[in-house]
């Protein structure tokens, strides 16, 4: 079992509750205090005469609202006339993913059940600070995480990078146009799972683009990242890295060469997604 992990959630498909934000409490208290002060002032102080009406000034035009759906997908011409329910979609998804990456890679690496829900939950979690590992559609990478200590400094051991090479090889070999064509054909299933996850009225393809863009912003490191181990799990010593999203931490963890290959494929997929939504 690795010592580097992200918090796991036994209910991966339920949208996590929003964390408590103390600034919201401060703002709420401030608003309440202002309301009470206004209430008592109107009762205890005489009402001043109304000021003369100001000359009419044309209000500045409101900025254009952002479109509700930023990356709409047109229905594929070869889309199935009817799609299975989410509960019955695993057979179709297994066939589609297996054809895309190969039967052996699928058997070795992919969790073969609740695939649509797992993919959607993982995509939604990647730009967040943490991701539920039990929701991910891939099996855990074999082997344990290794760190190297030199004096008082601990860093990622570069031997870790080799563990991810088989997974990265599969990603690098994916036919991006075929991947996006399959995604568009089955898109209603992904949308349904996203709404079920707790985002009714939100568009899953927009969230996918956000996740890809976030991954592409992962910084490139010149040397293995320094680590701290305040408790059981390792953390990045650099606060900027530790504050990064779950998806960016994955790319930082797999090493610069692996990350570069994954980013190259992400750029290809992004271009295909933009083309599928009528943009270039």
Q: Model-derived features: where do they sit?
A:
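N-terminal, positively charged topogenic segments adjacent to a membrane insertion site
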Residues: 1-18
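Hydrophobic membrane-insertion alpha-helices, especially the h-region
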Residues: 25-37
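A cross-kingdom marker for long, charged
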Residues: 34, 223-280
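N-terminal Sec/ER secretory leader and immediately downstream segment
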Residues: 34, 46-151
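Mid-length scaffold segments of soluble, non-membrane domains
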Residues: 144-206
């Amino acid at each position: 079992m690795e010592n580097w992990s992200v918090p796991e959630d036994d209910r991966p498909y339920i949208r996590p509750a929003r964390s408590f934000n103390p600034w919201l409490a401060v703002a709420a208290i401030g608003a309440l205090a202002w309301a009470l002060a206004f209430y008592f002032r109107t009762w205890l102080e005489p009402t001043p005469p109304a000021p003369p009406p100001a000359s009419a000034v044309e209000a500045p035009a409101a900025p254009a609202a952002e479109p509700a759906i930023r990356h709409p997908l047109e229905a594929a011409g070869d889309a199935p006339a009817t799609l299975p329910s989410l509960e019955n979609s695993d057979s179709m998804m297994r066939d589609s993913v297996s054809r895309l990456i190969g039967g052996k890679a699928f058997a070795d690496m992919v969790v073969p059940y609740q695939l649509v829900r797992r993919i959607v939950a993982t995509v939604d979690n990647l730009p967040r600070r943490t991701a539920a590992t039990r929701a991910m559609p891939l099996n855990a990478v074999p082997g344990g995480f290794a760190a190297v200590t030199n004096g008082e400094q601990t860093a990622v051991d570069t031997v870790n990078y080799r563990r991810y090479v088989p997974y990265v090889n599969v990603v690098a070999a994916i036919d991006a146009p075929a991947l996006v064509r399959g995604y568009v054909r089955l898109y209603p299933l992904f949308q349904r799972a996203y709404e079920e996850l707790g985002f009714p009225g939100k568009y899953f393809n927009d969230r996918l683009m956000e996740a890809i863009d976030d991954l592409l912003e992962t910084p490139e490191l010149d040397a293995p990242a320094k680590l701290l181990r305040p408790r059981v799990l390792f953390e990045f010593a650099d606060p900027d890295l530790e504050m990064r999203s779950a998806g960016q931490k994955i790319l930082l963890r797999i090493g610069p060469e692996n990350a570069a290959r994954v980013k190259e494929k992400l750029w290809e997929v992004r271009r295909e997604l933009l083309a599928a939504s009528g943009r270039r």
